[in-house]
Design a protein with these regions (language model features):
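A membrane-topology feature that recognizes alpha-helical transmembrane segments
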Residues: 1-235
Length: 235
């Protein structure tokens, strides 16, 4: 079962099962927001085809690659937990400007349980990453709101960065923020231009770019491309 092809196929199948579950979870959350008449326009900017592409194509492919890379080791569980959580949070935030805090809380609890069982020596630094990540973005949000007299971050963004901090550790939070900021400026700017929306006055969800930064930095850390951080976050 450790043959790369078998691992790849098995990972894709696991990703499909996970994708079907997360697709249903995201759809139910978005439908609930519409039914409760939450103060957004009631219709996602992108059709449900986005969810199908992300959960039924991208997630299985990423899961297959992770399985082929990790093999059947405990680290694969941690990888899939982070990947699945970030995928579903990114899609929900992109379509509704909201974050499902249930996903964040469950992911934090499962990661804590994983660390307790498989890497208890890293539990403390993971919790530090959680607290620093959440506190950092909350503090930056207060500063932005004070200076600009308007909210710049969503209420769930600090919790999302805290979640990411459990995987990348506090040293990885800076690179995550840099990737999120640059990708948000570039990709968000392109999206606004295509929609013919004003660049400075149209809100763009920041969560998807945090998810992109978190996943990218974590994979770079684990693959050894950030060796100066590996001693602190190699779990």
């Amino acid at each position: 079962m450790n043959h790369p092809v078998l691992l790849l196929v098995s990972g894709i199948l696991i990703g499909l099962l996970l994708g079907f579950f997360l697709h249903r979870l995201a759809s139910d959350f978005l439908e609930q927001q519409i039914s409760e008449q939450h103060p957004w326009d009631g219709k996602p900017d992108l059709p449900s085809r986005l969810r199908q592409i992300v959960f039924l194509l991208m997630l299985p492919l990423v899961s297959g690659v992770l399985a082929a890379w990790r093999g059947w080791f405990p680290e694969l569980l941690s990888d899939l937990l982070l990947t699945g959580s970030l995928f579903v949070l990114a899609v929900i935030d992109w379509e509704s400007m909201l974050l499902d805090m249930r996903v964040v809380i469950v992911a934090i609890m499962l990661k804590s349980a994983w660390l307790f069982v498989f890497a208890i020596e890293h539990l403390q630094q993971a919790l530090i990453g959680l607290l620093v990540g959440a506190g950092l973005l909350y503090f930056l949000g207060i500063i932005y709101e004070t200076l600009r007299k308007r909210r710049g971050l969503g209420e769930g963004d600090p919790a999302l960065l805290g979640l990411i901090g459990m995987w990348v550790g506090w040293p990885g939070l800076g690179p995550v923020m840099l990737v999120a900021a640059f990708s948000g400026i570039i990709l968000g700017g392109i999206w606004l231009l295509r929609k013919n929306q004003p660049l400075l006055h149209t809100p763009v969800p920041f969560g998807p770019f945090l998810c992109l930064g978190g996943l990218l930095v974590y994979l770079l850390q684990q693959s050894g491309w950030m060796p100066w951080q590996m001693e602190l976050i190699a779990f």
